Swiss-Prot record:
Xref: PANTHER family: RIBOSOMAL PROTEIN S15P/S13E, SMALL RIBOSOMAL SUBUNIT PROTEIN US15
One Pfam family from the record: Ribosomal_S13_N
Gene Ontology molecular function: small ribosomal subunit rRNA binding; structural constituent of ribosome
Protein's recorded name: Small ribosomal subunit protein uS15
Domain of life of the native organism: Archaea
GO cellular component: cytosolic small ribosomal subunit
Biased composition (Basic residues): 1-18
SMART domains attached to this UniProt entry: Ribosomal_S13_N, Ribosomal_S15
InterPro entries xref list: Ribosomal_uS15, Ribosomal_uS15_arc_euk, Ribosomal_uS15_N, uS15_NS1_RNA-bd_sf
Keyword Ribonucleoprotein among UniProt keywords: yes
Subunit record text: Part of the 30S ribosomal subunit.
PROSITE patterns given in the database record: RIBOSOMAL_S15 (PS00362)
Native source species: Methanocaldococcus jannaschii (strain ATCC 43067 / DSM 2661 / JAL-1 / JCM 10045 / NBRC 100440) (Methanococcus jannaschii)
Amino acid sequence: MARMHARKRGRSGSKRPVRKEVPEWVQYTPEQVEQLVVELAKKGYQSAQIGLILRDTYGIPDVKLITGKKISKIMKEHGLYPKVPEDLLNLMRRAVNLRKHLEQHPKDLHSKRGLQLIESKIRRLVKYYKSKGVLPADWRYTPETARLLVEQA
């Protein structure tokens, strides 16, 4: 698939093998995996980071295979998922950092263009999340709300 704001092709890479059953070498029960996810979420890790930690340190290839639930669903069940979705929060974090940079370097036109692209991605995601009911219908993106949300998170 192509990139959103470039005329280049997308990234290719290896794909995860399609598995329908839990590998026999995994020695964790679904309850243990769920408990690990909750512990890591309480430490402040995002769901993507939790997946990497479980894969690299605990040898758990896929949480959904073992528990039947995605990491984000486990976090939502225990009330640990953030109010604003993580992908939107990460984009807002990038926009806030770029705004700080542009305050010190106002003539950096390449970064100014990058900020425009990031904010257009944010607006796209906000539109999607409003239609899905994840965000309230009157929620609006402004640089100030983004700064407050990033500082809070």
